[in-house]
Regions:
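Cytosolic catalytic domains that perform sulfur/thiol-centered chemistry
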Residues: 1-281
Length: 281
């Protein structure tokens, strides 16, 4: 990879006027935060020059599932309208917890962008360094973006069912342990408790510290401690396909090959009574 996974706030502040740099604000409300107006939060203050990458709006609205990838041409049109150029170095951030920036990073990579980095420390780190924010929308000329979709990046429910039944790939679930273990209800209504049979639980929050991934040694210890093997194909899942990207990013930084994301995630699996669930009632 020609770009670093993360860039620092000091580096971005120094290069913020570089014409080859574009900044993308990918903050997002999590389930249970429906009262948040994230678009207004962006307008109230964002890193100068950053356009708003609305993951909710950039999902496939023809699907009943919350965050399925849009069609490549739909994504390309949206990026051109934002002024995003696929040949530039895109810097993505969220509000500070590394919740949604990895999903934006993964989407851009899956649609063919080669140079994408995440701002280490995110917006919170930028503000801790007393760096300036800008208010209002950012209007850019139409971007040049032709989506080149990578079908190897994502799997469907049938692939996951086969992996679960035949043990052809490891399934990593990024949800909190209480949800994985069926101890609490899902935040989205109508979903069963539990997890995909055979899945391993690696909560995404355990991989993150202050808007950045933990060290390589710490990540290795977490994955190995949960029974993950880097030598076997991996499918990452979560509640709706967002925080699974945190796990995918962590594995990418460790040079783990053959990792794919299950876009339907528990929003799909947990809604279907015909699919098996652990623990069984």
């Amino acid at each position: 990879m020609s770009t670093t996974w993360f860039v620092g706030a000091d580096w971005l502040a120094e290069h913020i006027d570089d014409p080859e740099i574009q900044i993308i604000d990918a903050r997002m409300a999590s389930p249970g935060q429906e009262d948040r107006n994230v678009a207004q939060e962006y307008l109230n203050g964002h890193i100068p020059g950053a356009v708003f990458f609305d993951i909710e709006a950039l999902s496939d609205h023809t699907s009943p599932l919350p965050h399925m990838l849009p069609r490549p041409e739909t994504f390309a049109v949206a990026m051109r309208e934002l002024g995003v150029n696929q040949d530039k170095h895109l810097i993505v951030y969220d509000e500070g917890n590394l919740f949604s920036a990895p999903r934006a990073w993964w989407m851009l990579r899956t649609f063919g962008v080669e140079k994408v980095s995440i701002l280490g420390g995110e917006l919170a780190g930028w503000q801790r360094d007393d760096l300036l924010l800008e208010e209002g929308a950012v209007e850019l000329p139409e971007g040049e973006f032709n989506a080149a979709f990578n079908p190897e990046a994502v799997v469907k429910v049938t692939d996951v069912l086969l992996a679960s039944h035949e043990n052809t790939a490891q399934i990593i679930d990024a949800r909190p342990a209480t949800r994985f273990n069926a101890e609490v209800d899902e935040p989205r209504p109508g979903l069963r408790r539990g997890h995909i049979p055979g899945a391993l639980n690696v909560p995404w929050t355990e991989l993150v510290r202050e808007g950045e991934l933990k060290t390589t040694d710490e990540l290795d210890a977490i994955f190995f401690g949960r029974g993950v093997s880097y030598d076997k194909p991996i499918i990452v899942s979560c509640g709706s396909g967002v925080t699974a990207a945190v796990v995918l990013l962590a594995l990418a930084t460790l040079d783990v090959p053959n990792v794919k994301l299950y876009d339907g995630a528990w929003s799909e699996w947990g809604a279907r009574a015909d699919l098996p669930v652990e623990p069984e009632k």
